[in-house]
Amino acid sequence: MTTLSFELPDGSTVEVDVRRLLNAGYAGRDQTEVQAHIDELAELGVPGPEVTPALYPVAPYLAAQTDAVPAQHGRTSGEAEWALVITGNGPDDVLLTVACDHTDRALEVHGVAWSKNANLDVLGRQAWRLTDVAGHLDQIALLGRVGAEQTVIQRATLAALLTPAYWLEVLRGRGEASAGTVLLSGTIAMIEGVDQFSDRWEAELIDPVLNRSIRCAYSVEQLPDPIG
């Protein structure tokens, strides 16, 4: 079982055994824009979901706090996201951190759920209690960067995505709002003209109200060609 460890702003550490990992998809707050994105993907051969927003169960062992992600080929890339981590039963037991959902784009055209289970979900090593940021979530910025030059490929505030409160209600309805559940938010649009197929990805949450940030970063290391 994967165990994640998070440092909180007060210096304390919280550990959680990951029992359930879920990746939200097509989770923009403006579902009209989401549908336009689905139509664009369909032209590229990526099958659309039957309903939006979507929610994809992912093998819990794919949740990782790591500096390197192995990839089978050169057509994989990250997605900057936030993540909810439930550590207990109380309101202060829901943590918010940054995450990067590394996705197999070659497999994605055959099935989004398959692509989500082909690579790691990388999470930050720090977290904030959701109760501490709930009042200004929409002001928190989410950025994705690629390459050694840290070129910005994704930039928005959390106002672009469905809220943690929305997803907590979904989890309660599914009986999954319990310790060990980790949910990634779904991502924001990529900036046109920036190559997503990079050997380095990072994601960052920036809180301008409390003047702090959380970051995760990793190299993408392509596996050797198979024999046989």
Placement of each model-derived feature along the sequence:
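Catalytic-core "active-site belt" of small-molecule-metabolizing enzymes
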Residues: M1-V182, A189-G228
